[in-house]
Curated annotation (Swiss-Prot):
Gene3D superfamilies: Electron Transport, Fmn-binding Protein, Chain A (2.30.110.10). The modification Phosphothreonine is found at T238. This is Pyridoxine-5'-phosphate oxidase. Binds 1 FMN per subunit. The keyword Phosphoprotein applies. NCBIfam families: pdxH, PRK05679.1. Pyridoxal 5'-phosphate binds at R42, G43, D44, R45, K100, Y157, R161, S165, R225, L226, H227. It comes from Mus musculus (Mouse).
Length: 261
């Protein structure tokens, strides 16, 4: 007997006990309607106004929000971020990484140069970062050019990591195809014994990047979906072009505006 039903829409309204049933439906080609899955954010009295900016330097504003995220007990890794890269012909990719430092010069992270993101940054050295702190209903988006960190800085950070993490970086030629997980286990054990009493050399294919911010957007959620968005961008260094009536001077070469949600 052949069933003529090709697809069905399922509205997700019930709690987690329905997970198994929903998974069953999904495997049968059902279309999962997740529209009702929404939560309340902040109210209008908690809106993020321009007067609430800690600083007109977006790096200082980021530091303020980042500190609140670090202090929030419901946020496990405040430095977790999505890093989006793109090939020269416009094919994007994204993944979660940990931010390992930030300052006036930009945002630092470390990875394998032979990974997909490493190859994309080589051919198209621009990236976007997104930090999402859900318990605070806040998000920060950063855009800008990326360059490799000096080898000495990468070396110093590499050897500050736990030895098991150093060995893991040597074990994994990130994004290469491997036969199975046992392959990693065996190689990890072999290298663990090899470097038991000696320093782990940093692989040439491992290092760091720094993203120099040209755009930084601060987003705070509102229950009525009239979210707050204040975006900073680098202004013209010469100052030849006058600012529009809704564009404001920030610190140094930054200008800022409010965007519609």
């Amino acid at each position: 007997m052949t069933c003529g039903l090709l697809s069905v829409t399922v509205t997700f309204r019930r709690p987690a006990k329905w997970t198994g049933y929903l998974r069953h439906l999904c495997c049968r080609g059902a279309v999962m309607d997740l529209g009702p899955m929404r939560k309340s954010y902040r109210g209008d009295r908690e809106a993020f106004e321009e007067t609430h900016l800690t600083s007109l330097d977006p790096m200082k504003q980021f530091a303020s929000w980042f500190d609140e995220a670090v202090q929030c007990p419901d946020i496990g890794e405040a430095n977790a971020m999505c890093v989006a890269t793109c090939t020269r012909d416009g094919k994007p990719s994204a993944r979660m990484l940990l931010l390992k430092g930030f300052g006036k010069d930009g945002f630092r992270f470390f990875t394998n140069y032979e990974s997909r993101k490493g190859k994309e940054l080589d051919s198209n050295p621009f990236a976007s970062l997104v930090f999402y702190w859900e318990p605070l209903n806040r998000q920060v988006r950063v855009e800008g050019p990326v360059k490799k960190l000096p080898e000495k800085e990468a070396e110093n950070y590499f050897h500050s990591r736990p030895k098991s993490s150093q060995i893991g970086a040597v074990v994994s030629r990130q994004s290469s195809v491997i036969p199975d997980r046992e392959y990693l286990r065996k190689k990890n054990e072999e290298l663990g014994q090899l470097y038991q009493d000696q320093e782990v050399p940093k692989p040439e294919y491992w290092g760091g990047y720094i993203l120099y911010p040209q755009v930084m957007e601060f987003w705070q959620g509102q229950t009525n979906r009239l979210h707050d968005r204040i975006v900073f961008r680098r202004g013209l260094a010469t100052g030849d072009s006058p600012l529009g009536p809704m564009t404001h001077h920030g610190e140094e070469d930054w200008v800022y505006e409010r965007l519609a949600p």
